[in-house]
Amino acid sequence: MASLEIIKLEWATPIFKVVEHSQDGLYILLQGQVSWQNSSQTYDLDEGNMLFLRRGSYAVRCGTKEPCQLLWIPLPGSFLSTFLHRFGSLLSEIRRDNSTPKPLLIFNISPILSQSIQNLCAILERSDFPSVLTQLRIEELLLLLAFSSQGTLFLSALRHLGNRPEERLQKFMEENYLQGWKLSKFAREFGMGLTTFKELFGTVYGISPRAWISERRILYAHQLLLNCKMSIVDIAMEAGFSSQSYFTQSYRRRFGCTPSQARLTKIATTG
């Protein structure tokens, strides 16, 4: 079983920044309040909450003056496949949900989950313990989530993660979303007919390809806007928008302000 690199993070970002994830995983909010956004929804994570998210890019903001502290637990495909195989008989008792998995799931931490997290943190502080103990604690955590009130949705998401065509699509889209292709070209380059491509895309992302591509480009442009000195028109072109005016409209619709206002806010915040 693959070794898992669990990371303790400290964030202090009062404005939305883009966080990219190449793996699926769990966030445990130890302190503070964090807002996560995808293309269709905002998720507010409070202290004492846990968040499961699928790989991809999200806009994230810390909602408190003090830095937020989080624990990030990556869940590689090989680890999840082993977990599902090892506990397949037990997990088969949970009702199946065949709907499209949600990209994010928030869990309230119950007393038993809290105890499990404390045990995991205690092991992480001991460098003399074998890594298998960490893996066992994570498996315990996953089982508790699977048998929680949202266990059906959680397990549905885990089962989809082991689907190879879906993993291949995610990798393909992350590598090519900036291409100026028509949708039929995306499907052809992926090796599918347009209808089949749309169906697979809906299963993986729960939204249309056009909506996902637009969201991904906006997040990429947002990252450029806040972290480099490129002009707004150059950022619009770099992110695949046909014009600066279209980019400005899309950005305002997504973040509630113009690109110029966002850049000024960034300057005022960071000094």
Swiss-Prot record:
<keyword id="KW-0804">Transcription</keyword>
<dbReference type="InterPro" id="IPR037923">
    <property type="entry name" value="HTH-like"/>
</dbReference>
<dbReference type="InterPro" id="IPR054015">
    <property type="entry name" value="ExsA-like_N"/>
</dbReference>
<dbReference type="InterPro" id="IPR009057">
    <property type="entry name" value="Homeodomain-like_sf"/>
</dbReference>
<protein>
    <recommendedName>
        <fullName>Virulence regulon transcriptional activator VirF</fullName>
    </recommendedName>
</protein>
<keyword id="KW-0010">Activator</keyword>
<dbReference type="Pfam" id="PF22200">
    <property type="entry name" value="ExsA_N"/>
</dbReference>
<keyword id="KW-0843">Virulence</keyword>
<feature type="domain" description="HTH araC/xylS-type">
    <location>
        <begin position="167"/>
        <end position="265"/>
    </location>
</feature>
<dbReference type="InterPro" id="IPR018060">
    <property type="entry name" value="HTH_AraC"/>
</dbReference>
<dbReference type="GO" id="GO:0003700">
    <property type="term" value="F:DNA-binding transcription factor activity"/>
</dbReference>
<keyword id="KW-0614">Plasmid</keyword>
<dbReference type="GO" id="GO:0043565">
    <property type="term" value="F:sequence-specific DNA binding"/>
</dbReference>
<keyword id="KW-0805">Transcription regulation</keyword>
<dbReference type="InterPro" id="IPR050204">
    <property type="entry name" value="AraC_XylS_family_regulators"/>
</dbReference>
<dbReference type="InterPro" id="IPR020449">
    <property type="entry name" value="Tscrpt_reg_AraC-type_HTH"/>
</dbReference>
<dbReference type="InterPro" id="IPR018062">
    <property type="entry name" value="HTH_AraC-typ_CS"/>
</dbReference>
<dbReference type="Pfam" id="PF12833">
    <property type="entry name" value="HTH_18"/>
</dbReference>
<comment type="function">
    <text>Transcriptional activator of the Yersinia virulence regulon.</text>
</comment>
<feature type="DNA-binding region" description="H-T-H motif">
    <location>
        <begin position="184"/>
        <end position="205"/>
    </location>
</feature>
<keyword id="KW-0238">DNA-binding</keyword>
<feature type="DNA-binding region" description="H-T-H motif">
    <location>
        <begin position="232"/>
        <end position="255"/>
    </location>
</feature>
